[in-house]
Amino acid sequence: MKKLVTIIFLLNLILASANSMQPDVFVQSTVNRASEILSKNISREEKINGLKIIAKQTVDIIGVGFYSLGSARKNLNNNQKQKYFDLFEDYFLKSFSSRLSEYTNPKIEVQSKKFVNENYTIVNSVLVSTSDRPEVKIDWRIYTKNPDNPLIRDLIIEGLSLARTQKEEFTSILNSNDGDINALFRTLENFTKN
């Protein structure tokens, strides 16, 4: 009986690890899905909507939002936090999908991965050069705390962290408005309306 329990336990472990998606496979799959949308002969609006769906499924928008807000999040009440995350999600999805929708048939090749710790893996890739653009190095910071649901936490393009850049921008807005969170809310609202 003890051997049977051990065998069942080992089989469950093997099946669980087989079902969890490796970060590099996750990135390549995500890139392939986005590339398929961008390659279609559909309107820009349809491309943006398709990219938003992919982002909601693959990006840790809440985690990126918390990070982008920095220490200011400690001063917010629950209503302000909820308002921030609603605004941030709209802002993030519009910013992300609008930028990507300009690309036609981008080819990204995953090259390697580096295990950082049980929560993070860095996946290294390149946006393949074309006659119109040079090769671009893209590193993906993948949150792997739940191996069955890896999520993108950051993109580092040619050494520049998009999450860190976002955090610096939000900090600047807050600092230039005496820490008034409503100034950041207005900025996010204005961006999503335009």
Question: What are these language model-derived features?
Answer:
Residues 135-137, 141-164:
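Short beta-strand edge/turn micro-motifs at domain boundaries
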Residues 73, 90-91, 129-130, 158-162:
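Solvent-exposed loop/turn segments at secondary-structure junctions
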